[in-house]
Amino acid sequence: MAKLSGSIDVPLPPEEAWMHASDLTRYREWLTIHKVWRSKLPEVLEKGTVVESYVEVKGMPNRIKWTIVRYKPPEGMTLNGDGVGGVKVKLIAKVAPKEHGSVVSFDVHLGGPALLGPIGMIVAAALRADIRESLQNFVTVFAG
């Protein structure tokens, strides 16, 4: 299983950073791998919430069924994803206070038979760049 992490300083108070990081309706604006939601988004997020989306890494799209397995505002949430071809994804989003703002971080764990071997390494490398770009987009969109 590939594990990738990234974080960025955000000049917003943690509560505001959390509000944006947990707003699924705005993921298309900053999260580069997110393409479109394939299910109706709930009005309230909570543990057990299920949503579906298309994600794309290195030109390879996949439909992912996400389940929120941890939801603790304004600190973080964890989504477990099951995709086509046995792809498994875990997305851990965290917001922590920092002097003059907050730190927003994402950890992504990738696994499943479709991501074994060289393909998995290629996807992991591309996703590492996507995480960095997404975090920078987050700052630009919400604090720029």
UniProtKB/Swiss-Prot annotation:
InterPro entries: Polyketide_cyclase/dehydratase, START-like_dom_sf
Spans traversing the lipid bilayer: none
Annotated keywords: Toxin-antitoxin system
A biological process term (GO) from this entry: negative regulation of growth
Disulfide bond positions: none
Keyword Iron-sulfur: no
Function in brief: Toxic component of a type II toxin-antitoxin (TA) system. Upon expression in M.smegmatis inhibits colony formation. Its toxic effect is neutralized by coexpression with cognate antitoxin Rv0909. Does not exert its toxic effect via translation.
Protein name in UniProt: Toxin Rv0910
Species lineage: Bacteria, Bacillati, Actinomycetota, Actinomycetes, Mycobacteriales
